[in-house]
Every structure is written in C-alpha cells, then in structure tokens.
From Swiss-Prot:
Pfam families assigned to the protein according to its UniProt record, in alphabetical order: K-box, SRF-TF
CC terms in the record's Gene Ontology section: nucleus
Keyword Iron: no
Cysteine-cysteine disulfides: none
PANTHER family in UniProt: SERUM RESPONSE FACTOR HOMOLOG
Name under which the protein is recorded: MADS-box protein ZMM17
Region feature (Disordered): 237-259
SMART domains: MADS
Primary localization class, coarse: nucleus
Domain of life: Eukaryota
Gene: M17
Subcellular location: Nucleus
Chain ranges of the MADS-box domain: 1-61
K-box domain residues: 85-175
Length: 259
C-alpha cells in the first residue's frame, strides 16, 4: 500500500512545523547540491526560517555574490543605491522643523508670541494653561502637606526627648535631695564625740586608764545634752576631797567637776 498524499497547508503545531522545516530544508539543499554536481549548474539557495535564521547554499564553482551579480545582469535590474548624505540632510531638516515648532509652542505658553493666534487658538491655549496651573497647584499642596507631616513628626520627637530629659533631671534632683537628707541625719553623730581637752582632763583627774574609762563613758553619754559653747560653765564636785578649793586637782583647767 503506497504512502498517502500529504495535504499542503501550514502546520499548526509548532514542534511538528520545526521538525518538518529541518527535514525539507535538508532535502532541498541536498537536491541543489546534486543538481550542481551532476549537471555542472550554478545553483544558489537562500532560506530564512520563521524565526529569521538564514540558511544558504551555493554551487562549489562560484560564490553567492557572483550569482546575484549574474542575476542582476541577466534581468537588467539593479539594487537601489542608498545616498547616506541625502538621508542625513533630510533627517536634519525634519529635526530642525520640529525644534522650531517646539520653540513656537514654548513662546506661546510664556505669552511672548501671541500675534499669530486666532481667537480659538487663544481659547485653547488658555484652557491648557489653566489645566497646567491646576496640576502645579495640586503638586504644590502635596509637597506642603508632606513638609507639614515631617515637621509634626520632628515636633513630636522633640517633645518626647524634652519629656525624657525633664524626667531625668527631676529624678537626679530627688536623688540629690535624698543624699543631703541622709548626710544631715549623720551629722549629729559626730557631735557625740567629747572634746579632746575634756576627755584628757577627766583621765588626768582619776589618775589612770581603768578609772577614766567609766568616767569617759559617762561624759560621752552626757555630751548630747551639752553644747560646745556651754563648756565654760563651772561644775562643783560632790566628793568631800573635791569640794576643797585648795585640793591639788580641784578643777579641770579652772572648772569644777560634779559627778
């Protein structure tokens, strides 16, 4: 049973279409090579795929350029030569005209060139300017609101810092006052120590360390009731031997002692 005839139409499946292109291209180039070799013909083939990739074949006896020149000579056709200088001149002229139009539009927007405008043109220009001004004002208000928000945030930050510093200062002041109160409470304790002259006189009177220790304790216990300025009062002794003013130790540096 022979092969069925394939319908010649575009293959919808891209994979099948690519596979068929590769097979048919290989077969075509093979047939072109056989024709050139067997018949000594000048054959040239140029193929572009659907993706734009180029494939070419030329018979071994010549090059593809030679075949194209031979084709042009045989058909009396020539490719149009491109004049690059003229193209550049045309492009420069076009750009110059465009720049003149832009400059004219700018002068009209600034109000410098309105003499050539009609009433309708002036009305259109006025509407365009009003629309532009409204957009500029909207952008201005947006920027002002952003700046105000930034200033409010900075103000809040400064207030928080100020509150924190104020609290720290108050805490330091309270701590300093507490320290002063504690020092004030400890100050009277220093007054409990007897004056050096007083303690020395008591020790000398009782004639020894053993007897002076008790007397010194009694004097120290009585010290809070005495003021430093009241040490000049005269104390009278209660012992008979101390009541005699002629006694050898009748007083302590001119003062009597009453126990």
């Amino acid at each position: 049973m022979g092969r069925g005839k394939i319908e010649i139409k575009r293959i919808e499946n891209s994979t099948n279409r690519q596979v068929t292109f590769s097979k048919r291209r290989g077969g075509l180039l093979k047939k072109a090579n056989e024709l050139a070799v067997l018949c000594d013909a000048r054959v040239g083939v140029v193929i572009f795929s659907s993706t734009g990739k180029m494939f070419e074949y030329c018979s071994p006896a010549c090059s593809l350029r030679e075949l194209i020149e031979q084709y042009q000579h045989a058909t009396n056709s020539h490719f149009e030569e491109i004049n690059h200088d003229q193209q550049i001149l045309l492009e420069m002229t076009r750009m110059k005209n465009e720049m003149e139009k832009l400059e004219t539009g700018i002068r009209r927007y600034t109000g410098d060139d309105l003499s050539s405008l009609t009433l309708d043109d002036v009305s259109d220009l006025e509407q365009q300017l009003e629309y532009s001004v409204s957009k500029v004002r909207a952008r201005k208000h947006q920027l002002l609101n952003q700046q105000l928000d930034n200033l409010r945030r900075k103000e809040q930050i400064l207030e928080d810092q100020n509150t924190f510093l104020y609290r720290m200062i108050n805490e330091n002041q309270q701590a300093a006052l507490t320290g002063e109160v504690k020092l004030g409470e400890m100050a009277p304790l220093a007054m409990l120590q007897p004056p050096p002259a007083f303690a020395h006189s008591a020790t000398a009177y009782y004639g020894g360390e053993s007897s002076s220790s008790g007397t010194a304790l009694q004097l120290m216990s009585a010290a809070p009731q005495l003021h430093a300025d009241d040490l000049g009062f005269r104390l009278q002794p209660t012992q008979p031997n101390l009541q005699d003013p002629a006694a050898p130790c009748g007083g302590l540096h001119g003062h009597g002692l009453q126990l």
